[in-house]
Amino acid sequence: MDRRLSKKEEERIVNELNKLQMIEMVDTSVNLTNKCFQSCITNFRIRKLDDEEQLCVYKCVEKNMFFTSALNNHFMKLSNEGMF
C-alpha cells in the first residue's frame, strides 16, 4: 500500500516543524543570554557593562556560536551520510 502524504498534510507538517524550529531557536537564545549573563555580569551598581564584562560576554557568545556551528556541521555530515 502506497501511503504518501497529501500536499496539504505535507504543508501542515512543514509548518509545524518550522514552528518547532523557531521555538528551539528562541529557547537557545534565551539560554545563551542567561548563561553568559550569569557568567559575566558581576557589578549591578552601575548601568553600563565595564570593559571586562563586555569582553566576557563577547567571548561567551562567540564560544557558544562556534560550538553550535560545529555541532550543526557534524549533524549535517551525518545526515548526508544517511546516518541521521
From Swiss-Prot:
Q: How does it sit in the membrane?
A: Peripheral membrane protein
SUPFAM superfamilies per the UniProt record, alphabetical = Tim10-like
Note the SS bond partners.
36-60, 40-56
* Primary residence: mitochondrion
List the subcellular locations: Mitochondrion inner membrane
Q: Which UniProt keywords apply?
A: Disulfide bond, Membrane, Metal-binding, Mitochondrion, Mitochondrion inner membrane, Protein transport, Translocation, Transport, Zinc
A GO molecular-function annotation: metal ion binding
InterPro entries in the cross-refs: Mito_inner_translocase_sub, Tim10-like, Tim10-like_dom_sf
The domain of life for this entry's organism is Eukaryota
Q: Which biological process, per GO, is one annotated for this protein?
A: protein insertion into mitochondrial inner membrane
**Keyword Protein transport belongs to the record:** yes
Assigned GO CC terms: mitochondrial inner membrane; mitochondrial intermembrane space protein transporter complex
Keyword Transport assigned to the entry: answer is: yes
UniProt motif (Twin CX3C motif) ranges = 36-60
Query: Subunit details for this protein?
Result: Heterohexamer; composed of 3 copies of timm9 and 3 copies of timm10, named soluble 70 kDa complex. Associates directly with the TIM22 complex, whose core is composed of timm22. Interacts with the transmembrane regions of multi-pass transmembrane proteins in transit.
Domain note: The twin CX3C motif contains 4 conserved Cys residues that form 2 disulfide bonds in the mitochondrial intermembrane space. However, during the transit of timm9/timm10 from cytoplasm into mitochondrion, the Cys residues probably coordinate zinc, thereby preventing folding and allowing its transfer across mitochondrial outer membrane.
Q: Which family does it belong to?
A: Belongs to the small Tim family.
Described function = Component of the TIM22 complex, a complex that mediates the import and insertion of multi-pass transmembrane proteins into the mitochondrial inner membrane. The TIM22 complex forms a twin-pore translocase that uses the membrane potential as external driving force.
Q: Please report the name of this protein according to its UniProt entry.
A: Mitochondrial import inner membrane translocase subunit Tim9
